[in-house]
Amino acid sequence: MAKLHDYYKSSVVAELTKEFSYTSVMQVPRIEKITLNMGVGEAINDKKLLENAASDMATISGQKPLITKARKSVAGFKIREGYPIGCKVTLRGERMWEFLERLISIALPRVRDFRGVSAKSFDGRGNYSMGVREQIIFPEIDYDKVDRVRGLDITITTSAGSDEEGRALLAAFNFPFRK
């Protein structure tokens, strides 16, 4: 079991129960899934870019990504419905906890000029979304084999009912919010 998951069960549940005065442990918010998304708009012209992005995503997450396709045709972007334009991975269970641990303790501190992540990126229902500008902050990515620097979106879906509860849950994991 991941260290962060043990920490959640032993400390965070008790801490949040006390802070929000929950009557049952099942009311305590928990992280349900983490979704990683990488949009590769340039893949229209060169399919190799999407394959490289998918292999980077697989290296970061530890599981094979799903290739996302365009939902509708947009002439301005020169895409047709069904064109492959990105990839995504949904992490749950053990892989999710391990990824969150690596994100908080290794990857985010490696971002250049890192001052913390915005505390305003909650969606109103306790879910948190953030963007990473370069995939090379993850130690699994070999810098010499990267064809181009790509960013990715990370969404942390929680069972929290409000932003305040979601923020308290992530703060309990020492998530580096900007002061």
Curated annotation (Swiss-Prot):
GO MF assignments: rRNA binding; structural constituent of ribosome; tRNA binding
One GO term of the biological process aspect: translation
GO cellular component, one term: ribosome
Keyword entries, A-Z: Ribonucleoprotein, Ribosomal protein, RNA-binding, rRNA-binding, tRNA-binding
Superkingdom of source: Bacteria
InterPro entries in the cross-refs: Ribosomal_uL5, Ribosomal_uL5_bac-type, Ribosomal_uL5_C, Ribosomal_uL5_CS, Ribosomal_uL5_dom_sf, Ribosomal_uL5_N
HAMAP family, per the entry: Ribosomal_uL5_B
Function in brief: This is one of the proteins that bind and probably mediate the attachment of the 5S RNA into the large ribosomal subunit, where it forms part of the central protuberance. In the 70S ribosome it contacts protein S13 of the 30S subunit (bridge B1b), connecting the 2 subunits; this bridge is implicated in subunit movement. Contacts the P site tRNA; the 5S rRNA and some of its associated proteins might help stabilize positioning of ribosome-bound tRNAs.
Family to which this protein belongs: Belongs to the universal ribosomal protein uL5 family.
UniProt subunit comment: Part of the 50S ribosomal subunit; part of the 5S rRNA/L5/L18/L25 subcomplex. Contacts the 5S rRNA and the P site tRNA. Forms a bridge to the 30S subunit in the 70S ribosome.
Protein name as annotated: Large ribosomal subunit protein uL5
Species annotation: Vibrio atlanticus (strain LGP32)
Annotated gene: rplE
